[in-house]
């Protein structure tokens, strides 16, 4: 049984009883309850009898201001900025990469300790905008073109050219990286 969740949505409510609401660590906490004494966060998910969580994007996405965590901007993360970096707004310290990495790994390990598999939702069909590291590395190579214009079949613009050998290699290596490291 697979349950789709968002790191932010799963514990952000003030009644969730977690120490780190809306964060990787919030989902790693055990023994959390709401005011009514009902299980929340990880314990709630475990009580559902699920076998896997499919976590909405947790790679670095663009439209959340990581410098203003109290601002509570909302986004599910389908605006990729860097495919191989954990999202900073879900960490307790977005300015230090090692914190993002450690806390995301702690969350995933907590799921595994409970016998829950983790499926990572990664959107490799587009990037947030054309001011991406891919575009800066090799202009127009990593993006699908329709003549002289950028293709927009994904309805997001900035459509990734997965048919390009190096883009395909990048995607495969990225998936392998996440599976191996997390």
Predicted regions and their residues:
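Substrate-binding/active-site clefts of carbohydrate-active enzymes
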Residues: 8-182
